[in-house]
UniProtKB/Swiss-Prot annotation:
Function: Catalyzes the formation of phosphatidylethanolamine (PtdEtn) from phosphatidylserine (PtdSer).
GO MF: phosphatidylserine decarboxylase activity
Cofactor: pyruvate
Catalytic activity as recorded in UniProt: a 1,2-diacyl-sn-glycero-3-phospho-L-serine + H(+) = a 1,2-diacyl-sn-glycero-3-phosphoethanolamine + CO2
Keywords recorded for this protein, A-Z: Cell membrane, Decarboxylase, Lipid biosynthesis, Lipid metabolism, Lyase, Membrane, Phospholipid biosynthesis, Phospholipid metabolism, Pyruvate, Zymogen
Protein name as annotated: Phosphatidylserine decarboxylase proenzyme
Associated pathway: Phospholipid metabolism; phosphatidylethanolamine biosynthesis; phosphatidylethanolamine from CDP-diacylglycerol: step 2/2
Length: 231
């Protein structure tokens, strides 16, 4: 039984219906044409690959902000946070992480703390790599207060191909760094907003690993050693 549980654990539940559908179509195609069946099997294998849900070794500290997603650090700039969260006109540092079709699309909590507010905003489906995607695209914005009191924002943004955002959080949730909280299908972007004077530990063009790459350390002067947990 544990083997079956482990098998389902490594695939995000959002992928079950797609994988089952692709597998069924592949079986039907194979009964008519072997080549079409092979194409269907390849498509099914890709679907399994897309919805993979691997464990990560998460650095544990109340001072850390880790990447909520796999992808490329596409942009780092000062920008206003999503207006729907009511944070006013104070700019923050925005770190934008672009996910392509081959990245893991499961999203993770970037820090220890409490969820203060959530807001889903329907919108357009511009290419997620464009700067205007942060403003106009469909998005799910989350405001949280870290265990040390800092307020940060993380935003799931739909893209040209991604047409579904899944967020399992609720206002008032106490959350831990690296916990899985959602997924975006298929190809997308995640923005993280941090206080202006935050010292970043990532740079533009860097590859980020969700749940592992440290974006910022608010206690950097105190220690550079962390414990790690597999999640």
């Amino acid at each position: 039984m544990k083997q079956y549980n482990d098998l389902f654990k490594i695939i995000h539940r959002e992928g079950y219906i797609f994988i089952a559908s692709f597998a069924l179509v592949s079986f039907l195609l194979a009964s008519f044409n072997e080549k079409l069946g092979c194409i269907g099997c390849i498509a099914t294998a890709w679907c399994i690959y897309f919805f993979r849900n691997p464990d990560r070794f998460v650095p544990i500290s109340d001072d850390l902000v880790i990447s909520p997603a796999d992808g490329i650090i596409q942009e780092i700039k000062e920008a206003l946070p999503p207006p729907e969260l009511g944070l006013g006109d104070v700019e923050m540092i925005r770190v934008s992480i672009f996910l392509n079709l081959f990245n893991v699309h499961v999203n993770r909590i970037p820090a220890n703390g409490k969820i203060l507010a959530l807001h889903y905003n329907p919108g357009k489906f511009f290419n997620a790599s464009l700067d205007k995607a942060s403003i106009y695209n469909e998005r799910q914005s989350v405001l949280m207060e870290m265990a040390q009191g800092q307020k940060i924002v993380f935003v799931q943004i739909a893209g040209l191909i991604a047409r579904r955002i899944v967020c399992d959080l609720e206002e008032g949730n106490e959350v831990k760094t690296g916990e899985r909280y959602g997924i975006i299908r298929f190809g997308s972007r995640v923005d993280v907003y941090l206080p202006l004077k935050t010292a970043l530990l990532v740079s533009k063009g860097q590859t980020a690993i969700g749940g592992e790459t440290i974006i910022a350390d608010f206690g950097r002067k105190k220690t550079t050693e962390f414990k790690f947990e597999r999640k």
